Amino acid sequence: RPTTESNIWDWSKEYRHIAPKTHTGLSGIAIESVDGGIIEQVTFNNISMEGIITPIFICLNHRRMNQHSGQSGIIRNLLFSNITAKAEGIIPTLIAGTPTGRITDITLRDITVEHAGGEKAMTKSLPENLKGYPENRMYGKENPAGGLYIRHADNILIENFHIRQRNTDERPSIFLDDATDIHIEKLQSTGSIAKKMIEHSKCSNITIDGRVVK
């Protein structure tokens, strides 16, 4: 597992011209630190995805501590921009840290995601899975959010995010759980009949288009 526990990364390279029509199966973009590795200062720009279930999956977990530092990993300072995704499933974009290992400083800008939809509202909380294998199904195949689920994370900017459901969906477009400093601007939602586009639990300092959410 050297790549998931390493604290030394070279993100200076720029990867272009990734082949189109590349079907990933689970998550189109997966950022995972579960063995103590540090992932920071990465930009994802100008990406179009099809044939995926979850557009973006960001997971910070405690499967193992780093063998050198004895610490859990870090995920911070990531930018996602100019992204479109046509998903074939119902599991939304996930940003999930842990109660003691929080994901910080993430920007989602100019993103359009399309999901199958057709789900009922979900009232139960997602289970923690602190040592599970990192993949979009690790918290279950159901999710309380139709387009974006954020848990154990701080300082997230969501700007010009458009969520579409092909079938009428009862879930809110965004669900926030134990999150702070979440700033949402220009959110668009199509196909959701939830009473609120955004639901939250145990959160603080949430703003939507500059207005504080209580």
Briefly describe each language-model feature range.
Residues R1-K214:
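Extracellular/periplasmic carbohydrate-active domains that bind, remodel
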